[in-house]
């Protein structure tokens, strides 16, 4: 039920974001033991954890920069860079190159780049990304047939997107962690909760996907 719901939400996101320059959510990955029934808690208390990989939008790329600040867990910043899309424009695609078109024309004819929406400086901001996802999920949920049977209750969080679904006497909680893949590996940097005071541009390394395969 949960992964099917996540697939539906992801499809709505992709359709709604097709002409924008926000991160592109990919298929959710289940993590943790709750999916295999390992949790010792009452079903009402179970939190299902999923990882949603984020890909850069057209005209952008993500470059991971290792942060050597004194933390036990390896952490990174996600540097957002613009790419030249002039060749795509010449092929007839309806997109202006952020690097080579005048700023005034870009403001008038095209949505802002990711650098001007969810970034702090040149770096993808965890808290801005989570806040954006919360806003969008309110709208996306109403477009799903499931919304007629389940009640969605969002639970505020700074570094993850957490919500509860209720129907009659059933309920479960889902916590979404966002991730950016390290090249072609099973290692991600993620928005998982961190120690107090960590900058919002810091993403923590996680092996959750690699562990989920065993």
Task: State what each model feature region is.
Residues 1-214:
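Non-catalytic helical "accessory" subdomain of NTase-fold nucleotidyltransferases
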């Amino acid at each position: 039920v949960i992964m099917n719901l996540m697939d539906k939400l992801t499809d709505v996101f992709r359709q709604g974001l097709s002409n924008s320059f926000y991160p592109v959510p990919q298929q959710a990955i289940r993590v943790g033991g709750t999916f295999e029934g390992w949790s010792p808690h009452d079903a009402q208390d179970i939190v299902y954890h999923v990882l949603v990989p984020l890909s850069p939008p057209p005209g952008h790329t993500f470059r991971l920069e290792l942060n050597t600040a004194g933390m036990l867990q390896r952490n990174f910043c996600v540097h957002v860079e613009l790419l030249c899309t002039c060749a795509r424009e010449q092929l007839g695609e309806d997109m202006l190159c952020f690097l080579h078109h005048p700023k005034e024309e870009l403001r008038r004819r095209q949505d802002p780049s990711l650098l001007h929406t969810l970034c702090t400086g040149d770096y993808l901001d965890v808290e801005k990304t989570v806040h954006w996802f919360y806003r969008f999920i309110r709208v996306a949920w109403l477009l799903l047939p499931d919304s007629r049977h389940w009640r969605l209750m969002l639970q505020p969080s700074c570094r993850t997107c957490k919500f509860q679904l209720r129907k009659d006497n059933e309920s479960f909680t889902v916590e979404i962690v966002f991730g950016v893949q390290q090249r072609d590996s099973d290692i991600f940097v993620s928005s998982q909760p961190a120690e107090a005071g960590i900058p919002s541009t810091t993403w923590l390394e996680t092996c959750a996907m690699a562990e989920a395969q065993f």
